Amino acid sequence: MAKQKIRVLIVDDSASVRQVLGTILAEDPEIEVIGTASDPFVAAKRLQNELPDVILLDIEMPRMDGITFLRKIMAQHPIPVVICSSLTPEGSDLMFEALEAGAVDIVPKPRVDTRQALMESSGRLREAIKSAARARVRPRAARKVIEQKLTADAIIPPPVAGRSRPTTERIVCIGVSTGGTEALYDVLEVLPPNCPGILIVQHMPQGFTAAFAKRLNAGCQINVKEAEDGDPVLPGWAYIAPGARHMLLVRSGLRYQIAIKDGPPVSRHRPSADVLFRSAAQYAGANALGIIMTGMGDDGARGLLEMRKLGAYTCAQDEESCVVFGMPKEAIACGAVEKVVSLNQIPREIMAWQQAKQPASAD
């Protein structure tokens, strides 16, 4: 029996972009473009006759913008939506607004300046469509800003790192991809300020992680920042790996620090959860908790297995609460996972582990 193709509707106001996207997707035998639309009104009429498996949607269009249309889709008949737009850091607020509204993923419009760039961006687009077709679509509620963060502490810069500042003996490392931007909100927003230091690899384009960290920081009791080379890992802080660079955990004497490195993609990603997890296995051992969350592919599975072999506690998000049960599934299959938990259990698991775990010797 032939495998059913993934049916895609393309919505973009540019005829040339619709043609390029259609050509790229048609090259994959698993994908079928069932139609195109020049704006959301045309798309809405098509949806009355046939519902696709995935909608590929631009944001900036005449008559109705993509985010407004996305909200209507989520309210009327939720369908996995991939945003395909000209990504710029200046437009990051729109990107995160789309994710909060229910978009599964965001990909840049294919680059045609070089053959290599076209191949890479085309592959990323097709991968996003396949990932979205497997996604569980869940409309999101609007996020609230934590008022207590908007005090003098938001104006006065923190003290310079020094020996008087606390260090953390326990480290949490998280690897996450598709569906992760909203899942991370759910985890971080309920963690108390005395939680362990947290290092996070979220697959995200270069230039967007600083804005993502800023948005998380506004909605959480803990502090969230884009990681920088040499950052000390402190309790009550979460560090987001910068886009297109690897993040590692290292030690400097008795202190944990962050190292940011260039290098080729690992497990097809940069930053890579495998890189973070392997460094945590090496430098933190039994003092680390490794968590793998929603996402497609197998990034993080091997690194998490190495963490477990060296004494770390390891968890995976369960299938029911994942947008895409790919990365956790691979980690479970290879024996890397000690416990499977739902998304809303992850914060409790972190704090229970911190309270129960006696740190191993730093020697």
Swiss-Prot record:
Free-text note regarding domains: Contains a C-terminal catalytic domain, and an N-terminal region which modulates catalytic activity.
Gene3D superfamilies: 3.40.50.2300, Methylesterase CheB, C-terminal domain (3.40.50.180)
UniProt-listed GO biological process terms: chemotaxis
Native source species: Rhodopseudomonas palustris (strain ATCC BAA-98 / CGA009)
Active-site residues per Swiss-Prot or TrEMBL entry: S177, H203, D299
Main location group: cytoplasm
InterPro entries associated with the record: CheB-like (IPR008248), CheB_C (IPR035909), CheY-like_superfamily (IPR011006), Sig_transdc_resp-reg_Me-estase (IPR000673), Sig_transdc_resp-reg_receiver (IPR001789)
Annotated SUPFAM superfamilies: CheY-like, Methylesterase CheB, C-terminal domain
Limits of the CheB-type methylesterase domain: 166-357
Record's protein name: Protein-glutamate methylesterase/protein-glutamine glutaminase of group 3 operon
Note: R.palustris does not have a group 1 operon.
Covalent S-S links between cysteines: none
Post-translational modifications reported in the UniProt record: Phosphorylated by CheA. Phosphorylation of the N-terminal regulatory domain activates the methylesterase activity.
Compartments where located: Cytoplasm
Gene Ontology CC: one annotated term: cytoplasm
All residue ranges annotated as the Response regulatory domain in the record: 7-124
UniProt keyword annotations, A-Z: Chemotaxis, Cytoplasm, Hydrolase, Phosphoprotein
EC number(s) per entry: 3.1.1.61, 3.5.1.44
Chain's role: Involved in chemotaxis. Part of a chemotaxis signal transduction system that modulates chemotaxis in response to various stimuli. Catalyzes the demethylation of specific methylglutamate residues introduced into the chemoreceptors (methyl-accepting chemotaxis proteins or MCP) by CheR. Also mediates the irreversible deamidation of specific glutamine residues to glutamic acid.
Reactions this protein catalyses: [protein]-L-glutamate 5-O-methyl ester + H2O = L-glutamyl-[protein] + methanol + H(+); L-glutaminyl-[protein] + H2O = L-glutamyl-[protein] + NH4(+)
Pfam family, one: CheB_methylest
Example GO molecular function: protein-glutamate methylesterase activity
Location of 4-aspartylphosphate modifications: D58
Broad enzyme group: hydrolase
CDD domains: CheB_Rec, REC_CheB-like
